Design a protein with these regions (language model features):
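Active-site rim/adjacent substrate-binding subdomains
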Residues: 1-105, 117, 121-126, 132
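Catalytic glutamate of the conserved HExxH
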Residues: 109, 113-117
């Protein structure tokens, strides 16, 4: 049994942690997203669970939503916001089970949600995660 007491952060505290983690990511990576809007919820909405055909709301830690590079740079630029959703309860469960730092988990979720959306390879995302 661990000697560490895990104190669950509030929604606001987790959002602050995500903003700090995002600010420490490489500038070139952050530039992919444009202005990022952060949403932290305890669980994903039912439509997200249904659209992604998830078995459980604990099956997803985060979700990126926004235009891709082609939509943002074409002749008819899409002006929809770039958003990242972080799901607090699944993140906290993962944190308690895996024993990784919460900061590391949040950074990992950010890098992978943004990276997958923009077509980065696993190797590229791993390099971004290691740059700090």
């Amino acid at each position: 049994m661990r000697d560490i007491e895990l104190l669950a952060p509030s929604l606001d505290q987790l959002e602050a942690l995500a903003r700090e983690a995002f600010a420490r990511l490489p500038q070139e990576f952050r530039d992919l997203t444009g202005d990022m809007v952060f949403f932290v919820q305890d669980f994903p909405e039912d439509d997200v669970i249904n659209d992604l055909e998830l078995d459980s709301p604990y099956d997803i830690l985060g979700l990126f939503s926004g235009p891709d590079l082609a939509e943002r740079s074409g002749a008819f630029q899409v002006s929809s916001p770039t958003m990242i959703f972080l799901y607090r309860r699944p993140i906290l469960d993962y944190w308690a089970e895996e024993g990784e730092s919460l900061e590391h988990i949040v950074r990992h979720v950010l890098v992978h949600e943004i990276g997958h959306h923009f077509g980065l390879s696993d190797e590229q995302m791993e390099a971004i995660e290691e740059s700090d």
